[in-house]
């Protein structure tokens, strides 16, 4: 433990918290252009083809972002909105694409958790037709 004299000479340093989404530079979202859209495989016990995109943000940083939901319409040169949020089983993927904004369409046929996937509310008659199958 330091003496009072040592603390007078040099104050204690604050612990600086590291950002989990540094490319966003403290912004909630950033716009970017897809430079590559591809699939990749997750870490060990999981198995799948996860859809990801390499994106050049408006601040000139290049990041890898996950494309959530089933099916997407993204291709090279698509303009997308990127938010923070990692994918636990994809190393290096620390961002998510926001569905339903700019060039990223919402998920078709989505009835639950629609706001997370940019899907509009179905018309009253259509909700029953596209319901759960038993």
From Swiss-Prot:
HAMAP family: Ribosomal_uS12_B. One of its GO terms (cellular component) is small ribosomal subunit. Gene3D superfamilies: Nucleic acid-binding proteins. It comes from the Bacteria. With S4 and S5 plays an important role in translational accuracy. Interacts with and stabilizes bases of the 16S rRNA that are involved in tRNA selection in the A site and with the mRNA backbone. Located at the interface of the 30S and 50S subunits, it traverses the body of the 30S subunit contacting proteins on the other side and probably holding the rRNA structure together. The combined cluster of proteins S8, S12 and S17 appears to hold together the shoulder and platform of the 30S subunit. This is Small ribosomal subunit protein uS12. Residues 101-134 are annotated as: Disordered. The modification 3-methylthioaspartic acid is found at residue 89. Residues 125-134 have a biased composition (Low complexity). GO terms for molecular function: rRNA binding; structural constituent of ribosome; tRNA binding. The keyword Coiled coil does not apply. Keywords: Methylation, Ribonucleoprotein, Ribosomal protein, RNA-binding, rRNA-binding, tRNA-binding. One of its GO terms (biological process) is translation. Part of the 30S ribosomal subunit. Contacts proteins S8 and S17. May interact with IF1 in the 30S initiation complex. Pfam families: Ribosom_S12_S23. Belongs to the universal ribosomal protein uS12 family.
């Amino acid at each position: 433990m330091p003496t009072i004299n040592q603390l007078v000479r040099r104050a204690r340093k604050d612990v600086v918290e590291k950002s989990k989404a540094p490319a966003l530079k403290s912004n909630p979202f950033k716009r970017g252009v897809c430079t590559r859209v591809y699939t990749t495989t997750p870490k060990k016990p999981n198995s799948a083809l996860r859809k990801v995109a390499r994106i050049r943000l408006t601040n000139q940083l290049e990041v890898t972002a996950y494309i959530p939901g089933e099916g997407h319409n993204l291709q090279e040169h698509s303009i997308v909105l990127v938010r923070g949020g990692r994918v636990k089983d994809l190393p290096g993927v620390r961002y998510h694409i926001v569905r339903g904004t700019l060039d990223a369409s919402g998920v078709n046929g989505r009835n639950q958790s629609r706001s997370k996937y940019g899907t509009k509310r179905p018309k009253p008659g259509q909700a029953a037709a596209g319901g759960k199958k038993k």
